[in-house]
Amino acid sequence: MSTAIVVFSGGQDSTTCLIQALTHYDHVHCITFDYGQRHNQEIEVAKSVALDLGATSHKVMDVGLLNELAVSSLTRDNIPVSHELQENGLPNSFVPGRNILFLTLAGIYAYQLGAESVITGVCETDFSGYPDCRDEFVKSINQSLVLGMDRKLKIDTPLMWLNKAETWALADKYGKLDYVRNQTLTCYNGVIGDGCGDCPSCDLRKNGLDDYLANKESVMADLESKI
């Protein structure tokens, strides 16, 4: 029996990963991290979506310590989300160490459940400039987890080389485009579905959807060549 852990936020990317994983694995467990995020409504959305789609189980883990250490527009209500990059070249929505912590804890959870894979929706093609979404980082932490726990584990990144339009196409391939569009929460301001239409996350999501809807055949062909 095959088992996977999906790092799950209830957003477009992780929901698309969950939809795909449910067709590939016998047991799919979701893990969501509560780090005091600005858009904490995502935790309730994640609970609802995981239950609705039929995940085997869903664990919500309190990692509030991250909020104390990582100052970001996603962890502080008094820091507006900016479209501009900071002096260090990163967006102010970057939460330092977030994926280091999330993937480490998901790897430990996989050890506990005997899961062979941890699935995360990080992407290097249309990412927001976060260094912990890069393929190089994921491969590095995957190797560290294998060495540190002396157990085979694969961190799977099905969206790594897909752009946002292709991610929409992947949801559509499984007949879930409307579900992902209407039920997920990607917006930094906590608006479900198409979002606030103003934050960087909404811009990325909308541009990808518009591209896919305008060029379905070619985008789907590009997707098929990558998966």
Swiss-Prot record:
Keywords annotated in UniProt: ATP-binding, Ligase, Metal-binding, Nucleotide-binding, Queuosine biosynthesis, Zinc
Superkingdom, natural source: Bacteria
CDD domains linked: QueC-like (cd01995)
Cofactor: Zn(2+)
Amino-acid positions noted as binding ATP in the UniProt annotation, renumbered to this chain: 8-18
EC number: 6.3.4.20
Binding site for Zn(2+): 187, 196, 199, 202
Cofactor mode of binding and number, as noted: Binds 1 zinc ion per subunit.
Described purpose of this protein according to its UniProt entry: Catalyzes the ATP-dependent conversion of 7-carboxy-7-deazaguanine (CDG) to 7-cyano-7-deazaguanine (preQ(0)).
Listed name of the protein: 7-cyano-7-deazaguanine synthase
